């Protein structure tokens, strides 16, 4: 663990807990905190405050206290949550308490031996340019001997239930938009040993959903995540205990949140009386359609946000409601940033394919709590009309076009793996792809060089995005293939998207098979 240092990147820091500069410990987190303290003290003339939250991971509480030691030692006022809290609540507290910076200690859905350090700025969103690079420079200039751990207790304020109460109130007021009989809707919920174990039931109950069944074995916070292989609600295995309970109680919906409760997974009862897992794109389609359908007097002063690798169907939904649609790079921080970048417009909602969704701007990051409430709102309204969420999704396909996506991740471990990922990206960058499953290529976007090349007339346009290692191929029929290396794991990710018209519910199975075959053909073209 001494051969290289654990580095602080644009998304913060994530690594294995242990001794040494290549591990998560009080010194590596202390170095981050000293650098951020230096930046705050240099760039602000008034006394600033920070807020610190942490999830259920092993050693999170001790590490959070050590982070508080360093901030307070540097004369910065600290608000520290007294126990584990969801990441969206940290974003909320940052805005509410008018802090300059927020820190959450979490490693999302990584294995139990990991922990991480995520940084939020005064708007409530994750750090973005130019602040991210400035913080990295400050942190890199800190030596371990520069870190001051001398806690100033008079500057450390523990936060107990007040922020919870306000967050619950605001989540309900923003998410409770349906008109159904909520007490008839049967919900199974698992926090997968994470931070939503108390707050999500309180939000659902407060909104009127009283028929709630919690997976008891997974309702206790546990940094070892003993009942699952991975605490990731994208993985069917993580929801298997919840689905078993759903079968036993005949539930309408299954909700699972990841350890820091920013991402949510859903399984819903279909027409065969089985539970279907929704992917992140499908969830985003359902929530966006429902939220927009409940709003009156929409126009282009309102906008919704998404990312370059998420379903293009969202754009069709936005256009049909006459609201503006904005797209950012992969990562939810770019959706949060839109709210700052377009102050004259009103943000309604936004989402990405990786199971993250945000409703309103009262938080500035993905929020599993409010998203789960809206999912129950649309689900219970469907139930009162005698349909289920799969029917609702198919209705969306009929209205806006049937879009189907598939993500394939290829793992390449170690130093050799990094080289291989780089080589795959370069091959794709220089490839002379002419078509996608027989449909003529019309556009190639390279976000690393910020260029889009029109494949019909050879025209080159500049892309108005920060540079990022993402490639997107698009053909005449709207088929797209995107490729990018993962920011947090040794993987390269391929996103396939195909679409066609769906005329009726009866046609769904047949057309679904056509799109599945199309995806199989594409994966073969890209050597899978």
What positions do the PLM features span?
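Conserved phosphate/anionic-ligand binding catalytic regions in large, soluble enzymes, centered on
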Residues: 2-22, 107-108, 191-203, 259, ...
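Phosphate-binding and adjacent anionic-ligand microenvironments
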Residues: 247, 251-253, 274, 294, ...
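An N-terminal, well-structured beta->alpha segment
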Residues: 1-67, 74, 157-184, 195
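N-terminal small/polar loop signature for handling phosphorylated ligands or for N-terminal nucleophile
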Residues: 51-114, 210-265
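Short acidic, glycine/serine/threonine-rich loops at helix termini
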Residues: 61-66, 91-95, 113-119, 148, ...
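Gly/Ser/Thr-enriched, mixed-charge loops and adjacent short helices
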Residues: 2, 6, 115-240, 245-246
């Amino acid at each position: 663990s001494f051969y290289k240092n654990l580095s602080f990147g644009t998304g913060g820091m994530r690594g294995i807990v242990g001794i040494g500069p290549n591990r998560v410990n009080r010194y590596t987190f202390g170095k981050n905190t000293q650098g951020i303290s230096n930046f705050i003290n240099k760039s602000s003339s008034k006394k600033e405050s920070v807020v610190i939250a942490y999830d259920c991971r092993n050693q999170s509480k001790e590490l959070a206290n050590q982070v508080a030691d360093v901030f307070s030692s540097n004369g910065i006022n600290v608000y520290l949550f007294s126990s584990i809290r969801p990441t969206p609540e940290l974003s909320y507290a940052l805005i509410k308490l008018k802090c300059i910076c927020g820190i959450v200690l979490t490693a999302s859905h990584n294995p139990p031996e990991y922990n991480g350090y995520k940084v939020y700025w005064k708007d409530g969103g994750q750090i973005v340019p130019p602040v991210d690079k400035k913080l990295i420079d400050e942190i890199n200039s800190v030596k371990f001997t520069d870190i001051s751990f001398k806690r100033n207790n008079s500057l450390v304020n523990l936060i107990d239930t007040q922020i919870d109460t306000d967050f619950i109130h605001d989540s309900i007021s923003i998410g409770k938009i349906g008109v159904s009989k909520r007490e008839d809707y049967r919900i199974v919920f698992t926090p997968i040993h994470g931070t939503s174990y108390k707050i999500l039931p309180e939000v659902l109950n407060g909104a009127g959903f009283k028929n709630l069944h919690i997976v008891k074995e997974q309702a206790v916070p546990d940094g070892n995540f003993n009942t699952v292989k991975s605490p990731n609600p994208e993985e069917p295995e993580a929801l298997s205990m919840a689905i078993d309970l759903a079968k036993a109680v005949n539930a309408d919906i299954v909700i699972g949140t990841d350890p820091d409760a920013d991402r949510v997974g859903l399984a819903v009862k279909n027409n065969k009386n089985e539970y279907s897992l929704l992917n992140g794109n499908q969830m985003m389609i359902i929530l966006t359609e429902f939220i927009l359908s409940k709003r009156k007097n929409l126009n282009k002063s309102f906008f919704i946000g998404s990312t370059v690798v998420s379903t293009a169907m969202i754009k069709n939904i936005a256009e049909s409601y006459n609201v503006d649609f904005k797209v950012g790079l992969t990562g939810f921080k770019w959706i949060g940033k839109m709210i700052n970048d377009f102050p004259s417009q009103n943000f309604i909602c936004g989402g990405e394919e990786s199971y993250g969704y945000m409703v309103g701007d009262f938080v500035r990051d993905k929020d599993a709590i409010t998203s789960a409430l809206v999912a129950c709102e649309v689900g219970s309204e469907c139930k009162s009309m005698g349909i289920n969420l799969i029917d609702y999704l198919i209705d969306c396909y009929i209205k806006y076009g049937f879009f189907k996506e598939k993500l394939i991740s290829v793992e390449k471990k170690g130093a050799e793996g990094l080289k291989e990922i780089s080589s795959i990206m370069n091959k794709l960058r220089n490839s002379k792809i002419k078509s996608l499953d027989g449909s003529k290529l019309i556009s190639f976007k390279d976000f690393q060089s910020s260029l889009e090349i029109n494949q019909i007339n050879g025209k080159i346009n500049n892309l108005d995005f920060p540079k990022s290692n993402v490639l997107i191929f698009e053909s005449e029929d709207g088929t797209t293939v995107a490729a990018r290396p993962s920011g947090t794991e040794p993987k390269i990710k391929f996103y396939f998207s195909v679409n066609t018209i769906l005329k009726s519910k009866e046609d769904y199975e047949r057309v679904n098979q056509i799109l599945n075959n199309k995806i199989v053909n594409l994966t073969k073209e890209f050597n899978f």
